[in-house]
Curated annotation (Swiss-Prot):
CDD domains membership: Ribosomal_uS17 (cd00364)
Gene designation: rps17
Keywords assigned: Ribonucleoprotein, Ribosomal protein, RNA-binding, rRNA-binding
GO biological process, one term: translation
HAMAP family with a match to the protein in the record: Ribosomal_uS17_A
A single MF term (Gene Ontology): structural constituent of ribosome
InterPro entries according to UniProt: NA-bd_OB-fold, Ribosomal_uS17, Ribosomal_uS17_arc/euk, Ribosomal_uS17_archaeal, Ribosomal_uS17_CS
GO CC field: cytosolic small ribosomal subunit
Record note on quaternary structure: Part of the 30S ribosomal subunit.
Similarity section: Belongs to the universal ribosomal protein uS17 family.
Protein name: Small ribosomal subunit protein uS17
Pfam families in UniProt: Ribosomal_S17
Amino acid sequence: MSNIGIDVKAPENVCEDPNCPFHGTLSVRGQIFEGIVTSDKGHDTIVIKREVTGYISKYERYEKRTTSLVAHNPACIKAKVGDTVKVMECRPISKTKSFVVIEKTENLE
C-alpha cells in the first residue's frame, strides 16, 4: 500500500485495480471535494452531487447550486448510493472521469 500524500484513512480491503491511488499506480494531485453518491451504475464509476453556495450581490443573498462529478470507484473502497465520500483530482481516466474516491466517510441511509 502506498502513501498518497494526504491524511486519509487507508482502506482495509486490498484490490488489484491499476487506477487505485492506494494499491495501483494512479497519482493524485489538485483539488479535494466531498459529496454524496447519487449513482453507482457504471463499471467502477460513481456520480457525486455536491452543493455549492454563491453570493449574489444585487440581491445581497446566497444561492445554493448543485454540481455533479464523475469519479472512479476503486474495488477496495466500493462506495454505494447514499455514501458521503471524498474525491481527489487525478489524471483523466476516461472522457469524463478526472477524479478518484480516496475515502468513504459515512452512509446516510
